[in-house]
């Protein structure tokens, strides 16, 4: 980079840092402060890209996450799940999904997330979903070597799978995640159920997945034992199975703190 360009970039960075240091963003809980910081940060990134682009024959792309990670930790998180994660016509589509809501909650707490969500309706560890995938296939698509955390959520869809086969496929799925992202923590959330009367087949799935998760050194969370949806029919859609938008917001409120705690334990 020619000295004149470097001087311009340095001058812009000093002006930006003087206006709104990133540390002030990380230590405030007021959403307006975050919005102002991000707005000014975006302006700086655009200005930097313009300066570099004008004076460089082959300008390198400037990514917002790269700038953010200069003064804070960017956490790459992979999520693998079923229709409770994809969302359905009952609720949880797009920005209403529990994942989108969870990232927003964590962002407001100063914890920046770069997510890769791979989910498929009707999928499970041992049963193929709407597009022919099991959780291992979804894991291969979502998990990256530099992930900080891999989250598995589900699945009630495994009710018809032989327990021995389910145990083997869950173990292989967790092993794949571990091999792909050796330094990542693994969080396994068992299948939820929208009522207090849980079928034995679902309890068996929960127990098999729990055992495989613990054997893999993962953290296991049990929505059934924690009675997430017991007495809350208002959170479930008209089909009696899938969460509505309020249900997804509720799930986000449950899972976001767990993800935050997992990321806080990073060395």
Predicted regions and their residues:
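N-terminal Sec-pathway targeting helices
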Residues: 26-45
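Hydrophobic membrane-insertion alpha-helices, especially the h-region
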Residues: 39-57
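Structural recognition of the beta-strand scaffold that forms the well-ordered cores
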Residues: 76-81, 85, 114-119, 148-154, ...
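Oxyanion-hole/transition-state-stabilizing segment in secreted/luminal serine hydrolases
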Residues: 120, 131-167
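Active-site segments of SGNH/GDSL-like serine hydrolases
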Residues: 153-157, 176-207
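Catalytic His-Asp segment of secreted/periplasmic serine-dependent ester chemistry enzymes
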Residues: 194-267
